[in-house]
Amino acid sequence: MKRINRRKFIVQAGAAAAATGLPTAPAEAQVGRKLGTCGPPPRKNPTRQTSAEGMPPLPLPAVPLRRSEPKAEPAPPLMIAKLEYGTTQDWNTDPGDIDNLMRHVRSAVGLWYGWKQMPLAELVALYQAKKESKVPALYLSGHEAFQFTPQERAALTQYLLDGGSLLADACCGRSEFANSFRAEVKAMFPRRSLDRLELDHPVFRSFHKYTTVNFRTFKGATRVDTVGPPELYGMNLGCRAAILFSPWDLSCGWDEHSHEHGQRLLPGDAIRLGINLVSYIAALRQVAEVQSVTREVSGKNERKRQQFVLAQLRHHGDWDPDPNSTAQLLRTIASVSSLAVAFDQKPVDAKETDIARFPFLYMTGFRDPRFSGEELGALRRHLQAGGFLFVNNCSGYAAFDRHIRDMVSKLFPDQKLERLGAEHRLFRSFYTLTEGRDRQSGAARPLELEGVRIRDRVVLVYSKNDAVTHLKLVSDPFGNGYDADTCSKLVTNVVSYAMQN
């Protein structure tokens, strides 16, 4: 195959990182290309010169000359592995995409990350040998439809559960790849969904703050440029989006070229969004590793009939994003109070027969819970009959806050959430609380709890700021919430108030 000069390719294509419009790739770059490739090869890694003393083959008294030998730069920490899958070159549609993206990350963020190509068979062999891959992220791209084997699905599933991330891009916006990827995600995680990320998701503010991007599509021979909110899809495991997918082409933009077909982000936006994706994965790496291990908390099985039982509501909005922090909530209650605690958590559906036995209900999540009218009726009757519901906004995102307010308006149409004043009994039920601390800055911040009253009793307490996940001292770095000490005291007071009233 004729070797493509990268500089010539880019000049002829008229590409640049901040470009807003690009013509078709040159014809000579299309000729003789292996199946699946639509971009030039990656640039050669740079070398540096290091001096070394040497004696030239000259008779004395010649002055010794200094000669230099090339030496490669030390390898940066590995961030992404580009997956080799299938039987064609379709996995490598843009050979220079990740290499170029890492250069932009280094330039913009000041952090140098490495990448490598990795056969999917290597990942399968690793997990079949009961080992783990320590690569933070795997990258998948292509044009054509594909299908994983059961062994490949099992390895990828375990990799994600172990704290890894999967980043996927439909090159040129090809629906064949997009549909196959969605089907594979569904096969790996049948009970979870790949949902469009809300604009307040941290991936859109992890480095560059995004509200709109530039899209390019083609209707026949007509080019259509539009501006709109970015479109990324994610699937959560714990408090992070472990799978991130773009149905709009990013890889051609990372590779600094474009084509007059398909659907894509313009290269400038593709590169900036790519920097955000890498920044998000890097920032959530510690959280991913902590949440990959679920800890069981147990205690003496004393006073069983008097034990406090926490029943967690199941719903459609990612109802159990962080099992470790829920277990830590129970551990906190047991360690600071004399309350007998049942450590076996009880997941329950919002059905009258399921929740009737549990006076204290706990709810958290990320997305719209989508309770049915029948489920809302069961919850309403339960709270009117003496039950209690504590709702915590996991990570404190605005999207879940909107959904909870909508849920409460349907649950109690004649009432609304009201801010609990500083004099409310809840803030004195165990600890005397006047203010909290922010988990990011450590600065003082008000305790913002809201509730719904029935007569003189608050039956529903809602914290729009995360009051639970930082109990384990590691939480979403982009989250909005209280520090560990405030979380501990606040949840203790909520439980104490519920038990006393």
Show the residue positions of the predicted features.
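N-terminal secretory signal peptides and thylakoid transit peptides that target proteins
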Residues: 1-17
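Sec/Tat signal peptide C-region and signal peptidase I cleavage site
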Residues: 25-28
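Aromatic-Pro/Gly-enriched surface loop or interdomain linker
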Residues: 30-137, 141-144, 250-251, 257-360, ...
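An acidic, glycine-rich "communication" segment
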Residues: 76, 177-257, 264-275, 306-309, ...
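Loop/turn elements at helix/coil->beta-strand transitions in domains of secreted/extracellular proteins
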Residues: 78, 133-136, 162-165, 239-241, ...
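Extracytoplasmic/secreted envelope proteins and their assembly/folding machinery
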Residues: 95-102, 153, 157, 178-182, ...
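Surface-exposed patches in mature extracellular/periplasmic domains of secreted proteins
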Residues: 112-121, 169-171, 192-198, 288-293, ...
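Short alpha-beta junction capping motif
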Residues: 137-178, 360-401
